[in-house]
Structure formats: C-alpha cells, structure tokens
C-alpha cells in the first residue's frame, strides 16, 4: 500500500465510511464521477486493514477537505501523485511557462517532481482549484544531501525569478519527508513526516549512511 499523497480509486462497491460529518452525499457523487481520493497519514484511529483518505473540494465548495476511511481491499487502483510534466498542460496558460522552466531545471539535476495540492487536483478533476494566490505544491524524491542542497538552491532561485511560491516536501529515504523550506533553514532539528507520525529528527539522521555491498 502506497503512503501519503498517493492517489487511490475505489471499487464501485467499496464500503467506505465518511469521517467528516455530513460528507457522505458529496463523497458518493465524487466517487460516482470516477475521481480519486488521496492517502492521508495514519493516526491510529483507523481499523485494521483500512486506510485514511481525503477528498479536497475546490474553492467553489469552500475548499473543504472531506475525510473518510476505506478498506485496503476496496482499492481498485493506486498511483503515485501526478508528475509536474503531466500537470503543466492543465495549469492556467499564464503559469505554464513558469512550470516549464522549473521542469527544465529539475531535469538538469536528474530530478522528477510530483505535484499535490490545487494544481494537481485541477488536472485530475477538470474543476477550478488554481487561483492567483495558489501555491505550487511539490514532492521531490531525494536520495542524498547533495541533491537536497542543489534542490534548495534551485527552488530559491526559481521563486525569485518568477514570483510564484513553491511549497512542498523532500521525499527522503525510508518513506520520510521534510518541508523543503525547513530543510533550507539552520535549525539542527527538523520536523520529519512519515506515513504514521511526525517527529523531530537531527539533520544528520535524514540520510542514513549505507555501507557498500
């Protein structure tokens, strides 16, 4: 089972349970339209064999995030978040050159960012999620501290050049993640998110040393 930010499509006969009060009718419509939910971090409240999911509604519906639980066995399909190159054609026309510039810089560093948040949901649903103040939320698979430092520099320069805010996380080894802005800071400890919890870890623990085979 994939972790946080993964996209899941439920079976038509899935027996999911709404956690957000009153959300069941809207969730029924959502899944009937063939739309996915996103995997949320486990908090220990879900039943064995089940997963916490979220459905973020567009601004026209108050940007409410609907929470639900579903059995893992009721998942018909599960994929990684959309890549930036897949999202770019669905973004507002004025923003597309900025995203293309970021994509080119990422490729130059052998990085392939994934997208979550408003830009991703607009591409997935065809509904209007992106507005003038929308941030670009990105997930960056990173394997080494050298890659992380290069990425921080890349993102800082891109924001300065284009005026669009890029939020998101560095996806670290062992299914951990850290906010890239926090990583760019000077604190000796950073907040690390996993599929099950959040905890403070020293920077030195983010990239475990791997012995040669």
Swiss-Prot record:
| Alphabetical keyword list | Nucleotidyltransferase, Transferase
Q: Which HAMAP family match?
A: Malonate_MdcG
EC number annotated for this UniProt entry: 2.7.7.66
Q: Which InterPro entries match?
A: Holo-ACP_synthase, MdcG_C, MdcG_N
The family this protein is said to belong to: Belongs to the MdcG family.
What name does this protein carry?
Phosphoribosyl-dephospho-CoA transferase
> Do you know which Pfam families this protein is assigned to?
MdcG, MdcG_N
Purpose = Transfers 2'-(5-triphosphoribosyl)-3'-dephosphocoenzyme-A to the apo-[acyl-carrier-protein] of the malonate decarboxylase to yield holo-[acyl-carrier-protein].
Top-tier EC class: transferase
Catalysis performed (reactions): apo-[malonate decarboxylase ACP] + 2'-(5''-triphospho-alpha-D-ribosyl)-3'-dephospho-CoA = holo-[malonate decarboxylase ACP] + diphosphate
